[in-house]
Amino acid sequence: MSFDIAKYPTLALVDSTQELRLLPKESLPKLCDELRRYLLDSVSRSSGHFASGLGTVELTVALHYVYNTPFDQLIWDVGHQAYPHKILTGRRDKIGTIRQKGGLHPFPWRGESEYDVLSVGHSSTSISAGIGIAVAAEKEGKNRRTVCVIGDGAITAGMAFEAMNHAGDIRPDMLVVLNDNEMSISENVGALNNHLAQLLSGKLYSSLREGGKKVFSGVPPIKELLKRTEEHIKGMVVPGTLFEELGFNYIGPVDGHDVLGLITTLKNMRDLKGPQFLHIMTKKGRGYEPAEKDPITFHAVPKFDPSSGCLPKSSGGLPSYSKIFGDWLCETAAKDNKLMAITPAMREGSGMVEFSRKFPDRYFDVAIAEQHAVTFAAGLAIGGYKPIVAIYSTFLQRAYDQVLHDVAIQKLPVLFAIDRAGIVGADGQTHQGAFDLSYLRCIPEMVIMTPSDENECRQMLYTGYHYNDGPSAVRYPRGNAVGVELTPLEKLPIGKGIVKRRGEKLAILNFGTLMPEAAKVAESLNATLVDMRFVKPLDETLILEMAASHEALVTVEENAIMGGAGSGVNEVLMAHRKPVPVLNIGLPDFFIPQGTQEEMRAELGLDAAGMEAKIKAWLA
């Protein structure tokens, strides 16, 4: 994919931050306009995260203009907003390959560029890493500066506040920029407030402030009076008391779309000592009206026609597994007012929009707080309610201790609806749902189910919801279901699989939604095919029966082979001294990069052709 760079004459001059800093300051507003148009042109033709990057154009330009990157270290939280950063740091001509197999990584990635200081993808990690980087820079002694950019969603997570609390204690020289992209510019953002921000960040104010501290340090009453006076003056127009209490020097809020004003403020703050906090207000989707009006829809986009202002509509084919879950959730809630549903800021992705509208008093979006989500669910269960935690596989990792300590040990009936299990596609290493079976399987009192289709998914959700002896989990993938008929809901017998096809010599034990591919292989090789359904408890009787009646077994799962469902089958056979050969097919022992689900399954040998080739090579 190529772009006519001549349409962007100022941007054409910039393929590195060194070239950016050669531009006269007066040309930067024009650069921002071109950068925003280039981003629209590229993402609309390739797909990707969109609205966040439109909102950080001026901030990105200002940061790279003021700071000597990559010597000075710039850290982006999550990374959805970092497309302009990639464009300005030598990757302009490759931006059309982002999120594609072999293309640019969807997030800042250390292995891709020296400008990407921290590999990211999950939220709220930037300040913690930034403190460590700032401390290391201080010990290095080369006056290397550290800047972290974090959004108003990510900063709500406990990890961010833990980090800020630590920064206030050890006081490293660093800047945290809060990118506050609420739907409208705060009423505090205007000429007066921008002027105040520049004044408060200026050297004169800072010198007077520090000098006053020294002069009156021996006169506590006067020192305390001056401190209170400063707090009252700032408090009238500055909403930063919390950050000041955490030990930061707070500046803002300022207009995040005034690139020249940002440069002035950043230059003032660059040489200040201790932890600094700059609060900027931006508009998500800035410069593209449809994205400004609906930033959630335009957060991540497929290929689309910018002139239409609309994203392509779904073809109306098979429902996604997320929708299957959402429909089941609404159906069950209508019958049981004890049902409570919890999501850590994933309402749309988890299929909970309709539920949130129909049952607002039983819907809880706890924000980016996975640990709290799980323990909150534990509390609801203790109170006699039936909590369901809808969460992506990759984000459940962040609440592992809570699953163990707050739910499983207490045998609380919490249902985990684990979306995005297995290969997720374009978001790459940080988002693959590769490990949930491995990290949940070792937890006592846990029931773990792997549906092979949408009907089985519904039955398993129903089974888990009515299981009262401890926690349960149902894991299902990103993408569409397979089109089977939905039957009336009924509880499945816990820990029991079913034989789908009888064959000879070889038995394939399938866990989950790779079943259609496994069925093709079983037909081709005349193998027995088993839908195992439960990873925990395993159907040991069925496993031993298959071992006794077949020459070899193959396990299939879209999870890491190490510690996964296949490992559980191996353990059963070894415990019963059954030396039958077993081939475990699943995700290999490396982090799976980006690519479509189809591309990655084919590359990893998890489609029918790949599985059959692996089995034949193993049997040869």
Swiss-Prot record:
InterPro entries: Dxylulose-5-P_synthase, THDP-binding, Transketo_C/PFOR_II, Transketolase-like_Pyr-bd, Transketolase_BS, Transketolase_C, Transketolase_CS. Thiamine diphosphate binds at H80, G121, H122, S123, G153, A154, N181, Y288, E370. Gene3D superfamilies: 3.40.50.920, 3.40.50.970. One of its GO terms (cellular component) is cytosol. It comes from the Bacteria. SUPFAM superfamilies: Thiamin diphosphate-binding fold (THDP-binding), TK C-terminal domain-like. Its EC number is 2.2.1.7. Keywords: Isoprene biosynthesis, Magnesium, Metal-binding, Thiamine biosynthesis, Thiamine pyrophosphate, Transferase. Mg(2+) binds at D152, N181. GO terms for biological process: 1-deoxy-D-xylulose 5-phosphate biosynthetic process; isopentenyl diphosphate biosynthetic process, methylerythritol 4-phosphate pathway; terpenoid biosynthetic process; thiamine biosynthetic process. It catalyses: D-glyceraldehyde 3-phosphate + pyruvate + H(+) = 1-deoxy-D-xylulose 5-phosphate + CO2. The keyword Magnesium applies. It is an enzyme of class 2 (transferase). GO terms for molecular function: 1-deoxy-D-xylulose-5-phosphate synthase activity; magnesium ion binding; thiamine pyrophosphate binding. Catalyzes the acyloin condensation reaction between C atoms 2 and 3 of pyruvate and glyceraldehyde 3-phosphate to yield 1-deoxy-D-xylulose-5-phosphate (DXP). This is 1-deoxy-D-xylulose-5-phosphate synthase. It comes from Escherichia coli O157:H7.
